[in-house]
C-alpha cells in the first residue's frame, strides 16, 4: 500500500489559512496571506506570511506547520533547534521591514502556538507559557488563542 505524498506547500498554505482565520476571528481585522509567502522585496513592506492589507502592520507574521513537535529537549541540547531557525527567519524578516517579529507555529494535530517578544497583560502569565533564552534570543511562547484572548496589543497603527 502506497502512502499519500504530503505536499509541503499545500500544508504550509493550510497552516497559514488556519492562523489567518484565527487572527481574523480574534482581532476583527481582514488578515490575508502575503502573495508569494514573503518572497517579495522588503521595499514592498510585505515580509512574512500574513498581513492586513491597506493598513500599517506592526508585526511581521511568519507561520510554520510541521509534522513534529519542536518544543522539546532539543531547545536546550541541539546546536540550532528548528524553532530557533524559524525565529531567526522571523526576526530577520521583521528587521528588514521595521516591524515586530511574530511567529505562529504548530505541529500535526496540535493547537497553534505563538512566539513573540511582546505581551501587554500580566494576566497572560496566569496561563501556561514558556520563555526561551539562549545566545542572542529571548522570546515568549503562548498558545495563540490564549495570547489573542487576553492581549490588547494593536496589530495595525
State each model region's role:
Residues 1-157:
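Catalytic phosphate/metal-binding cores of nucleic-acid and nucleotide-processing enzymes, i.e., regions
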